[in-house]
Amino acid sequence: MTGKEMVNARNKLGFTQRQLGDALGLHWNSIARMERDELPIVKQTELALAYLLLVKKMKGGKR
C-alpha cells in the first residue's frame, strides 16, 4: 500500500488523520508520515485499514 492509497482509504472512511490513528492504535503523526511515504505501511496496518473499509461497506457506508 502506498501513502496515496492510504489517503484515499482514509477519505473513504471520512476520517481525519487523528481519527484513523485512534482507530488503528497509532499516533496521528505516524499516519501523516505514512501518507507522505516517510514511514512504511506494515501489513498489519494495511489489513486493519482494509477491515475498517469492509465494515463500512457492510454497514452501507454509515459510520
Per-range role (PLM):
Residues M6, N29, T45-L47:
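Short, intrinsically disordered, low-complexity terminal segments
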Residues Q17-Q19, H27, Q44:
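Glutamine-centric residue-chemistry signal
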Residues G25-P40:
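Recognition helix of helix-turn-helix/homeodomain-like DNA-binding domains
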Residues M1-K12:
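A short, Lys/Arg-rich alpha-helix, primarily the initiator
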Residues V42-K62:
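DNA major-groove recognition helix of helix-turn-helix/homeodomain DNA-binding modules
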Residues M6, L20-G21, I31-M34:
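Conserved hydrophobic/aromatic packing and binding residues within compact polymer-binding modules
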